[in-house]
Amino acid sequence: LTILRRELLYTSLTEDDQIIEEFTFTPESNIPFVEPRAWHRVTPLTDDLECYLEFYCEPKNYFSNKYELNPAHSEVVEAVKTIKPCKVLDLGCGQGRNALFLSSLGFDVTAVDQNIPGLQYLKNVAKAENLDIKVAHYDINTAAIQNTYDFISSTVVLMFLNPECIDNIITNIQEQTNIGGYNLIVSAMSTEDAPCPLPFPFTLKENELKEYYRDWELVKYNEDFGHLHKTDANGNRIKLRFATMLAKKVQ
């Protein structure tokens, strides 16, 4: 809350509209930060009051709120609690929800995808936000990553790729990860107890991703149920089993 002219009455309230405390603020006042979900009321004390409100959000939600992107993937948000800013490849970046989030935290981001309109959108947002993100067109099926990285992230991507290329793709990802670096993969599964309800070109089997990374340190691994942003005929987000893995290259 910033006051440019005159004064206002700020009232802090309970959820049932009971007054907790009141303050009169002017342009000279040291106005405290209004906490999220804090009930309050603002009352002008003059007819010519000039003021404005600025709304803040967490970094993980900033780009989704401002540019109507999906939020940064929850596993990427979780991973940065372990991984400090470093050289990262967002493999299959889409419109850049994860690349933008990582870049805003100080990561040196390269973002690649085959979707040219999505890449252009990412370039536009990065320019508007003054973020230095290297954006490139790349067919993941070629398994031809050239540079090495400290962190390679590929969330909700493998299931859209050519099944015959998966072995080479994962090998290439692993080879281009520096020792001590990390891979984050989240991808759809199809298992006996939970057949995949969508016709993805590729789905992981039980323990398949874990086996690919048997020589790595598994920081996190599960095969839990999750939801796609895509909805079914009733408007419910589609539920299926995902392999979720954060692994560290130790040799």
Residue ranges and their predicted role:
Residues 1-9:
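Short, conserved beta-strand element in jelly-roll/cupin
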Residues 16-36:
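Short acidic-glycine-tyrosine-enriched beta hairpin
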Residues 167-179:
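A short glycine-rich, Lys/Arg-flanked "PGG" loop and its adjoining helix->strand segment in the class I
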Residues 58-83, 89, 95-133, 137-144, ...:
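Class I (Rossmann-like) S-adenosyl-L-methionine-dependent methyltransferase catalytic domain
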Residues 86, 150:
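Conserved acidic residues
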Residues 153:
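A conserved beta-strand element that flanks and buttresses the S-adenosyl-L-methionine
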Residues 156-157:
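Short catalytic micro-motifs in class I SAM-dependent methyltransferases
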Residues 36-57:
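Ligand-binding loop in jelly-roll beta-barrel domains
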